[in-house]
Amino acid sequence: MGCIEHKKTPATDDTGQDYNPYDVMEPRLPGKTPVDRRNGKHVKANDIPPEGVYLPNNNILAPHMKSPEYVQLSNAAAITLGIMGGRMYRCECTRCLNLLLTYPEGCRANCAYCGLARHREAERDYADRNFIRVDWPAVPMRDIVDIVAKDPENSPFHRMCISMITHPRSEQDTFDVLEQWTNKIDPNAIPVSILSNPTTMTRDDVQRTKDLGADIFTVALDAATPELFDRTRGKGVQSPHKWKKYWDIMLEAKDIFGPQKFGAHIIVGMGETEYEVLNLVQQLVDLGGHSHMFCFFPEDGSLMDHLPATPRDQWRRVQLARYLIV
């Protein structure tokens, strides 16, 4: 379900409201990006070859890394794999290995709450952007596969998830990354999920992910209503995503993957009412799908980094209601 940081998420905001209303949660408009910073132009022009693991560092020019040869993974996953130093606080490992596709051009969408959004190319290279409040080292995919393939039955990871981004190569590279994994690691030992990019996908793409070994297909709706989706993920922030296309692909996944093998991510506290988010949860249940809920927390560098985190009371009410629904 996700969690909140109690010290920074009071039960109510400064005005005494115990929810984030729509009129307060207005993203900033994206600014213009200098021509020489667009589409990873300077990274590709310098063409610095990568050398093994790349740890995000905004003080240097990022190497020219791209999927399917390279993927990014969270600090927690990198620590668990043993490819970077550090210890997990109050937990020895993370159980899901999330692999994020990566390119010098970065994600071409511009979602208001996301640290990977296109507008950030004005300030930092794609490989150096924070996402979900942590860094994501870039690692050769073959290295990840080789480490996990040594003993998948006893791996700390219980699942692997490929996270797509909005990029012209995203579909084919997802297939390639998935094949690299399943060629050496039995999906029965470590099942595979796809966190999809519906904007550029077709039904055939959805079918191919299943044919290659994925057993769960998820769509990151994130916003609970069409209006909120458009405001934070669509034309409101000069981004290409459309609510209808996301639903179309999710319904294709329903047909292809079957009950409880498809679903959606939902972020609570971006301006929706509690009725609206729970109505979405109910729709997913009625379809035979699942929901993954997260509470909004402002991501540094995003177009919503000035807005309040989800009040604790709102988050707990929605969590409890979802529990009763599902």
Feature locations, PLM:
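Surface-exposed amphipathic alpha-helices with a cationic face
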Residues: 178-187, 210, 250-258
